[in-house]
Swiss-Prot record:
This is Probable ECA polymerase. GO terms for cellular component: plasma membrane. NCBIfam families: PRK02975.1 (NF002820). It comes from the Bacteria. Belongs to the WzyE family. It comes from Salmonella agona (strain SL483). One of its GO terms (biological process) is enterobacterial common antigen biosynthetic process. It is a multi-pass membrane protein. It is found in: Cell inner membrane.
Length: 452
């Protein structure tokens, strides 16, 4: 890459970043937080944060990358995607009407809410315990990270249930919403994330998500400033780099440490070059249509229920890894959101996907506002827990693609909804048995004496 080509890419990158960052800043000033703000920051991180890292790798370490015209296509496709997404998100589909009282779809009381978070926590802890009994601490047993996907590891399906510890702790926080509950959420979820990191063999998702939710709650409540958020972000990047070194068993120093930091940070937070690789091999892609979305559900179907279930799930990530890159190392390479759309339908699917994503984020913001307006604090805690709990799925959406997002959000919805139903059933059984008693609030002694 020549300096002239780099200069052209830099101009496009600066204009695109300024465009998205400006819209995000205006939205932040208007509402402080909603899921449009979160997705916009996530989109910036995924598709634009990696460009400076790639530039240093190219000019400092002479690392090979895709041709400049392909990198330009990747940057422009990301900017155009966001433009279509933003217009879709801001377009009102129907006239705003004055809220009229309507019968709620469901309601929650104190006992049902506490039962819900206990059930969610139980699902996570029992899954971790069973996985640990089968495999022990994989971080200290396996020689490479790719081995966690091999036949040496049993009960892999249980990992999908670990994440429900975070929604459980979110319910606990939203019932109190003070600084102590906020700090308790951080300590409990990060401790659980470190435990799963050691048990699973290097999976950092639970730690990243817990830390991100903690920061956004702090921004919403005004407990941390934007500068503190930036400082925490830098700390998070360094922390994720250290965990990655431990995961891959790397011992580096000097220039090698700097080089390793650059490419691991880029691959962890901003796999934008994967989109460039996909566009570079555009002519080799056999467009898959909506099949990757259907196939991604296969992993949630146990073999005892479907004995003939395909052992290889050809979702967009696996198609990109195996068929496009011819990489059979055992790890799936993230195609990114835009890359998954290209795999499914080529360039035509990029604006269509942007419209779909705009509607998805609009729905989550509607649900979030519903929780903000809800007078029943127990129901509000459940709604907010569901919305913030889905942050993991939004990260999957940006990094892995639309197919992975759809299957995971449906799974999350089913498990979360089933926990609610079980909590309501248990409450009905306890109430029928006479085990539920109304809480009586006693008046302070001074007020009692004043009434005598």
């Amino acid at each position: 890459m020549s300096l002239m080509q780099f200069s052209g890419l830099l101009v496009v990158w600066l204009l695109s970043t300024l465009f998205i960052a400006t819209l995000t800043w205006f939205e932040f000033r208007r509402v402080r937080f909603n899921f449009n703000v979160f997705f916009s920051l996530l989109f910036l991180l995924t598709f634009f944060f990696g460009f400076p890292l790639t530039s240093v790798l190219v000019f400092r370490f002479d690392v090979g990358v895709a041709p400049p015209e392909i990198l330009l296509q990747a940057l422009l496709s990301a900017a155009c995607f966001y433009g279509v997404y933003y217009v879709t998100y801001k377009t009102r589909l129907r006239k705003r009407v004055v809220d009229v009282p309507r019968k709620p779809l469901f309601t929650m009381n104190r006992v049902e809410t506490h039962l819900t978070w206990v059930i969610l926590m139980g699902i996570a802890l029992v899954s971790v315990a069973i996985f640990f009994m089968h495999n022990g601490f994989l971080l200290f047993r396996l020689h490479s990270y790719s081995q966690i996907f091999s036949s040496e590891v049993s009960g892999v399906a249980l990992k999908r249930f670990f994440y429900f510890f975070i929604p459980a702790m979110l319910v606990v926080y939203f019932l109190r919403q003070d600084s102590k509950a906020w700090l308790f959420f951080l300590v409990s979820t990060v401790a659980f994330g470190l435990l799963t990191y050691m048990i699973v063999g290097g999976t950092r998702a639970n730690i990243i998500i817990a830390f991100a939710i903690f920061l956004f709650i702090g921004i919403i409540r005004g407990w941390i400033s934007l500068w503190m958020l930036v400082a925490a972000g830098v700390l998070g990047i360094v922390g994720m780099f250290w965990l990655a070194l431990k995961r891959y068993g790397l011992n580096v120093s000097g220039d090698e440490a700097f080089y390793t930091f650059l490419y691991l940070t880029r691959d962890t937070f901003s796999p934008w070059e994967n989109l460039a690789l996909l566009l570079q091999n555009y002519h080799n892609i056999d467009f898959q249509g909506l099949a990757p979305i259907v196939r991604d559900f296969y992993v949630f179907i146990p073999t005892w229920l479907w004995p003939g279930r395909p052992s290889i799930v050809l979702n967009s990530a696996n198609y990109f890894t195996w068929e496009v890159l011819n990489n059979h190392s055992g790890l799936a390479i993230s195609p990114t959101l835009i890359g998954s759309l290209v795999v499914m339908g080529g360039a035509l699917f990029i604006p269509l996907g942007a419209i779909v994503v705009g509607l998805i984020i609009k729905w989550f913001d509607w649900l979030y506002e519903l929780g903000n307006r809800e007078p029943n604090r127990y129901k509000a805690a459940i709604l907010h827990s569901f919305c913030f709990g889905a942050i993991f799925n939004m990260i999957v959406l940006a990094r892995e693609g639309l197919d992975s997002f759809v299957s995971r959000v449906v799974f999350f919805l089913v498990v979360f909804g089933a926990s609610l139903l079980v909590a309501k059933l248990l409450f009905w059984l306890f109430d029928s048995a006479g085990l539920i008693h109304k809480r009586t609030t006693s008046l302070p002694q001074a007020q009692v004496e004043g009434k005598l």
